[in-house]
Design a protein with these regions (language model features):
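Bacterial N-terminal signal peptides that target proteins for export
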Residues: 1-7
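Hydrophobic helical h-region of N-terminal Sec-dependent signal peptides
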Residues: 7-13
């Protein structure tokens, strides 16, 4: 009888004692750059990563979009901080100056910034991509299919090392007789494209972030001319995806792909487990985060043209050399 009473009492306790609820999912904040979703560039690539992460990880999302002004960027980031986000992801280098200030004001908040390494703060993970590796493969591939013996890279004025250590090195490793040239641009990208085509380049690597549709127009205009030497293009995604159309796609030889979606998944997974990326990107400058490269699939090289597809084995060998480049 005593045993029955004890059991009955235990059953009553079981009914009355509340079952501990699972912990509420963390909140991930994301600050999209100008235009937000639908830009077919870094915003969309980041959103794709969020969606993929949501299939296997438990978290909520708070999203904001900036109009691009410094005041608005700060306003958007502060709104995410106020919502107690476990991690705030800023898409694009435009948020750099804002995070440089707010990271010190809110040292317990974890931030990440995509495609930028300018914020020196231990609570900011800079997520960047080994662009030199991609440039090496672009140069190697351009030389493989060049018929004029001259290939070109259109670059920003601060990309001299990218040309020397990446594109030019890839060209020389591919075919020593092919001449790599570079056109640094501070003004018109279309003029730069016209000039390198006039100089004899028949494959162009466009390394600039934020594409200029005029470059594509110049290439198309050249290629539709009778008896013209056809020009191929190697571009970067998601940097230049916005300007790629059904008309220009047929002139794409290859694409260097920055796997922003993969980086977003990794960042969120780290945050949920209570960690962050703290690899040394530049110890002297105090920059931390992660550099994604060919190893691990952070940078991919997508062959577009049939002509280049026949060079696939050689490009795979070149990729093994490219992934040893640290920058």
């Amino acid at each position: 009888m005593k045993t029955r009473l004890v059991l009955a009492f235990a059953l009553v306790l079981g009914v009355l004692t509340p079952v501990a609820s699972a912990a509420d999912p963390v909140t991930i904040g994301i600050a999209y750059d100008i235009g937000g979703r639908g830009d077919k560039s870094f915003n969309d690539a980041s959103a794709a990563g969020l969606e993929k992460a949501g299939k296997t990880l438990d978290f909520k999302v708070e999203a904001v979009v900036t109009d691009g002004t410094s005041a608005d960027r700060e306003k958007r980031i502060r709104s995410l901080i106020a919502k107690n986000c476990s991690l705030i992801i800023a898409v694009g280098g435009g948020y750099g100056p804002t995070l440089q200030v707010l990271a010190f004001e809110y040292p317990d908040t974890q931030f990440a910034i995509i495609n930028d390494a300018s914020v020196a703060a231990v609570n900011v993970s800079s997520v960047i991509f080994a662009e030199t590796q991609g440039a090496y493969l672009a140069g190697f591939s351009a030389a493989q299919i060049s018929k004029t013996g001259k290939v070109a890279m259109i670059a920003n004025t601060n990309q001299a090392d990218l040309f020397k250590d990446g594109f030019s090195a890839g060209v020389l490793a591919s075919k020593k007789k092919v001449i790599p040239v570079v056109k640094y641009v501070s003004g018109s990208y279309s003029q730069a494209a016209t000039q390198v085509i006039a100089a004899g380049a028949d494959v162009i690597y466009l390394s600039t972030q934020g594409s200029d549709a005029e470059v594509f127009k110049v290439i198309v205009a050249n290629n539709v001319k009778k008896n013209s030497k056809k020009v191929g293009l190697i571009n970067i995604e998601p940097d230049q995806y916005l300007a790629v159309t059904s008309e220009t796609k047929k002139y794409l030889a290859a694409t260097v792909v920055k796997r922003v979606d993969k980086a977003i998944i990794d960042i969120i997974s780290k945050s949920i487990s209570g960690n962050q990326f703290l690899d040394y990107l530049d110890l002297d400058a105090g920059l931390f985060g992660k550099r994604y490269g060919i190893t691990g699939g952070g940078i991919e090289f997508t062959i577009r043209s049939k002509e280049l597809q026949s060079k696939g084995d050689a490009i795979n060998v070149a990729a093994a050399s490219a992934e040893k480049i640290l920058a």
